[in-house]
């Protein structure tokens, strides 16, 4: 079979899921799950290598359309198909999923309780998350979205902390409850018009009445806003992070939150552009609320996990502002922020888990003075914190700068609105280094807790932990120094999406029409297209 016709995405999705089914058959000679760990890590690594090969050989950066397409009739009577593919919106997040999931397998090495079931869920989650980003059928997307909740719930409920049952139940109630909006909106879109179809491209090509679009958009926004999360739909996240283990942290922060951002791009902006034009100012304001509220709340937290969790919510606010900017630069910054936060969030939460394994406390008041005994941990914490506070030369700086400049140059909003939004968001940016640097001081240089510093478990980072952080820092710094590494993957798709969104904004459309009219009055200029706006 030729490279171009090989079913790459189906193979990449099904390999970890099928491999998970063989875990119960594996021997466990030492009773510690060593064989199962290595098996799962190798499966994850092989799947990621296949993903990189597919990307390198079959993905064309200059093509804005769907690539690596596979489509098989499943239930043709209702237009249901197994249809997968990748474009600029999904490919960066598919690569991110493979990368973070493989590292999470390695991060899970200390897990010894019910090892078989733990790695079974990890592998099933791996394939399921890629399916969410690759599927091109809205009903299958809903099934994948729902099935993804089951491994997360079990990973929280079985391997979480003292309040794991509460956190897992809250997670499932929030996410499963909000998913009803996806189901209702999906059925309404599919059965609207003469053709019954759940295909993304068919749904995007349909014309919907504006009132109907607004209802669909609101339903999707609630469902995806829970997963992003958007304040005030965020309260499940600090509780989930507060009880999760390190590998589950990495999957939550690195991948799960990006599912909400991706769906807003794909469904809300891509399929409902007229409704997006009306909701965009609300998205921008919600983004500002996310940035400010979560930054202030993080500043007040004394629990290390909850502090980083609120920091994550704050950073995801930039995704909303970029999505509502109506500029290619703003949309590009929003996409880059999702990739950047996936890497930075995974690194910070892994370090939180590694620190807890040594100190057995999450309270900053009980830490202090451990810098002398954990110098490598301090170096890793400091570097990752610098990435989170958007230090120049790291991915977060480029992403946030692109969002700010993209929004500032948008011609969809008046100057007073832009000044207010940028000023308020800038306050959140200023707060970030304050709470992160004070956190580092309290952990490593605060008043020494002799009971803690003299304990035998307080040892420096081991090679496995250094390797995981090094793997995460390479793309963080690489993107920060050369953003085109990532932006070239989705630029062509975002050019197409930006044009579609801008044509739906009355102010921009009127300006474009006026520009064309003015040009038509000049000899030799009538055939020329109006220059890009913003």
UniProtKB/Swiss-Prot annotation:
Disulphide bridges, residue numbers: none
Keywords of this entry: Membrane, NAD, NADP, Plastoquinone, Quinone, Thylakoid, Translocase, Transmembrane, Transmembrane helix
Pfam families on file: Proton_antipo_M (PF00361)
Protein EC: 7.1.1.-
Topology versus the membrane: Multi-pass membrane protein
GO molecular function: NADH dehydrogenase (ubiquinone) activity; ubiquinone binding
Subcellular location: Cellular thylakoid membrane
GO CC list: plasma membrane-derived thylakoid membrane
Listed transmembrane segments: 6-26, 38-58, 93-113, 117-137, 138-158, 171-191, 210-230, 245-265, 279-299, 313-333, 335-355, 377-399, 419-439
Record keyword Transmembrane present: yes
Entry's Gene Ontology BP terms: ATP synthesis coupled electron transport; electron transport coupled proton transport
Main location: membrane
InterPro entries the UniProt entry points to: NADH_Q_OxRdtase_chain4 (IPR022997), NADH_Q_OxRdtase_chainM/4 (IPR010227), NADH_UbQ_OxRdtase (IPR003918), ND/Mrp_TM (IPR001750)
Catalytic reaction annotation: a plastoquinone + NADH + (n+1) H(+)(in) = a plastoquinol + NAD(+) + n H(+)(out); a plastoquinone + NADPH + (n+1) H(+)(in) = a plastoquinol + NADP(+) + n H(+)(out)
NCBIfam families: NDH_I_M (TIGR01972), PRK02546.1 (NF002713), PRK12561.1 (NF009212)
Sequence similarity: Belongs to the complex I subunit 4 family.
Record's function text: NDH-1 shuttles electrons from NAD(P)H, via FMN and iron-sulfur (Fe-S) centers, to quinones in the respiratory chain. The immediate electron acceptor for the enzyme in this species is believed to be plastoquinone. Couples the redox reaction to proton translocation (for every two electrons transferred, four hydrogen ions are translocated across the cytoplasmic membrane), and thus conserves the redox energy in a proton gradient.
Name of protein: NAD(P)H-quinone oxidoreductase chain 4 2
């Amino acid at each position: 079979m030729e490279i171009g016709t090989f079913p790459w995405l189906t193979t990449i999705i099904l390999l970890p899921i099928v491999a998970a089914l063989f875990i119960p058959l594996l021997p466990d000679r030492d009773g510690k799950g060593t064989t199962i760990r290595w098996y799962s890590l190798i499966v994850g690594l092989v799947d990621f290598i296949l993903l990189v090969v597919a990307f390198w050989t079959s993905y064309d950066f200059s093509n804005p359309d769907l690539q690596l397409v596979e489509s098989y009739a499943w239930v043709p009577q209702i237009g249901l198909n197994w249809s997968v593919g990748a474009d600029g919106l999904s490919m960066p997040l598919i690569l991110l999923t493979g990368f973070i999931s493989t590292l999470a397998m390695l991060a899970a090495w200390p897990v010894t309780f019910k090892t078989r079931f733990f790695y079974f869920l990890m592998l099933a989650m791996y394939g399921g998350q890629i399916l969410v980003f690759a599927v091109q059928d809205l009903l299958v997307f809903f099934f994948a979205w729902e099935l993804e909740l089951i491994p997360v719930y079990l990973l929280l409920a079985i391997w979480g902390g003292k309040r794991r049952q509460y956190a897992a139940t809250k997670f499932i109630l929030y996410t499963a409850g909000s998913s009803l909006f996806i189901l209702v909106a999906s059925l309404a879109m599919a059965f609207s018009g003469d053709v019954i179809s759940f295909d993304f491209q068919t749904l995007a090509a349909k014309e919907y009445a504006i009132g109907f679009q607004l209802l669909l958009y609101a339903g999707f926004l609630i469902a995806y806003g829970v997963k992003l999360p958007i304040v005030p739909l965020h309260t499940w996240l600090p509780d989930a992070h507060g009880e999760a283990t390190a590998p589950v942290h990495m999957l939550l922060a690195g991948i799960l939150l990006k599912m909400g951002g991706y769906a807003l791009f794909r469904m809300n902006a891509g399929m409902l552009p007229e409704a997006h034009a009306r909701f965009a100012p609300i998205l921008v304001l919600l983004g500002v609320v996310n940035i400010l509220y979560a930054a202030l709340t993080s500043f007040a937290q004394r629990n290390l996990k909850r502090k980083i969790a609120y920091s994550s919510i704050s950073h995801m606010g930039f995704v909303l502002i970029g999505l509502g900017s109506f500029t290619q630069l703003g949309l590009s910054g929003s996409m880059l922020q999702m990739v950047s936060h996936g890497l930075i969030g995974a690194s910070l939460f892994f370090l939180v888990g590694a620190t807890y394994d040594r100190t057995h406390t999450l309270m900053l008041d009980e830490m202090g003075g451990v810098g002398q005994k954990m110098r490598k941990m301090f170096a890793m914490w400091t570097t990752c914190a610098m990435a989170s506070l958007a230090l120049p030369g790291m991915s977060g700086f480029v992403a946030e700068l692109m969002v700010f400049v993209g929004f500032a140059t948008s011609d969809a909003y008046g100057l007073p609105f832009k000044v207010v939004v940028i000023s308020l968001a800038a306050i959140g940016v200023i707060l970030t280094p304050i709470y992160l640097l004070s956190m580092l001081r309290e952990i490593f240089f605060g008043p020494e807790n002799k009971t803690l510093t003299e304990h035998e478990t307080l040892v420096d980072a081991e090679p496995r932990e250094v390797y995981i952080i090094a793997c995460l820092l390479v793309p963080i710094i690489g993107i920060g120094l050369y953003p085109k590494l990532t932006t070239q993957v989705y630029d062509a798709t975002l050019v197409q999406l930006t044009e579609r969104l801008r044509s739906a904004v009355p102010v921009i459309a009127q300006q474009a029409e006026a520009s064309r009219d003015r040009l038509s009055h000049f000899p030799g200029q009538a055939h020329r297209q109006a220059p890009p706006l913003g």
